[in-house]
């Protein structure tokens, strides 16, 4: 029975998701339906948490709005609402959950960038 469920879940999983981790800055394009029209809306922020549970995987993205308020949004990784995910920059962090960023503001909330290897 569980083999059948696993096979169906594997069939519904997305294969076009890039590899990203907490601390990375990502641009998530979300499908928004307004009346009859459908468009993609960009949500850019830092990944503060990632939950890997197969088809039920999710990740939390936090961005600072124009008035200084933090906005967090949880996205289901394999949801059809998520149009695409683009990694803008990779961050260096030593924790899996970056909930401490909620209390930090300004320059204290910055994350170091992971630079590429020199050849």
UniProtKB/Swiss-Prot annotation:
Q: What does this protein do?
A: This protein is located at the 30S-50S ribosomal subunit interface and may play a role in the structure and function of the aminoacyl-tRNA binding site.
Q: Which GO terms describe its cellular component?
A: cytosolic large ribosomal subunit
Instruction: Give the similarity note.
Output: Belongs to the bacterial ribosomal protein bL19 family.
Report if keyword Magnesium is assigned: no
Any one GO MF term held by the record is:
structural constituent of ribosome
The residues forming a coiled coil are none
Mind listing the UniProt keywords for this protein, alphabetically?
Ribonucleoprotein, Ribosomal protein
Q: What is this protein's name?
A: Large ribosomal subunit protein bL19
Q: Does the keyword Iron apply?
A: no
InterPro entries assigned: Ribosomal_bL19, Ribosomal_bL19_CS, Ribosomal_bL19_sf, Translation_prot_SH3-like_sf
Task: Name any Gene Ontology BP term.
Answer: translation
């Amino acid at each position: 029975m569980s083999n059948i469920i696993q096979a169906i879940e594997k069939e519904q999983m997305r294969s076009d998701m890039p590899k990203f981790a907490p601390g990375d800055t990502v641009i998530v394009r979300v499908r928004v339906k307004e009346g009859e029209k459908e468009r993609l809306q960009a949500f850019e922020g830092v990944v503060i948490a990632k939950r890997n549970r197969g088809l039920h995987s999710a990740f939390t993205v936090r961005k600072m709005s124009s008035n200084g308020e933090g906005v967090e949004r949880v996205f289901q990784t394999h949801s059809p609402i998520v149009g695409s995910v683009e990694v803008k920059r990779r961050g260096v962090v030593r924790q899996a959950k970056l909930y401490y960023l909620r209390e930090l503001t300004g320059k204290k909330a910055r994350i170091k960038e992971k630079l590429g290897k020199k050849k």
